[in-house]
Swiss-Prot record:
Involved in the maturation of [NiFe] hydrogenases. Required for nickel insertion into the metal center of the hydrogenase. Belongs to the HypA/HybF family. It comes from Shewanella baltica (strain OS185). This is Hydrogenase maturation factor HypA. HAMAP family: HypA_HybF. Zn(2+) binds at C73, C76, C89, C92. PROSITE patterns: HYPA (PS01249). Pfam families: HypA.
């Protein structure tokens, strides 16, 4: 299950941002997850809930925004937002398309709290 290694890297990235901003804890982690990223949202949530317990993210809520697939057709030049996992142009049925968005997982925002000293 590669979601564990993905969450491990995500938490490491969160810890780096917290350290750079002198934060005591992270309370919210917002990510954008593309439908073609190969990551299963429910498994990612489970892995996050497990790994966060021993980190600065232990009180954090993970918010996952699913990013639909966005393609550009090389034949008719139409840009399409697709909810299904296909690279066929819905306008002209061409397979000559290029993926513009929906393949990545990105850390979008962190909510952090400072020390109260």
């Amino acid at each position: 299950m590669h979601e564990y290694s993905i969450v491990s890297a995500l938490i490491e990235q969160c810890e780096q941002h917290a350290l750079a901003n002198h934060a005591a804890k992270i309370t919210r982690v917002d990510i954008k997850l593309g439908v073609m990223s190969g990551v299963e949202p429910s498994l990612l949530q489970t892995a996050f809930d497990t790994f966060k317990l021993d980190s600065i993210c232990k009180a954090a809520q993970l918010n996952i925004q699913i990013q639909p697939l966005v393609i550009l057709c090389q034949d008719c030049q139409s840009e399409s937002v697709l909810s299904e996992r296909t690279v066929v142009c819905p306008t002209c049925q061409s397979y000559r398309t290029r993926v513009l968005d929906g393949e990545d997982m990105l850390l979008m925002q962190l909510e952090m709290e400072q020390d109260e000293d």
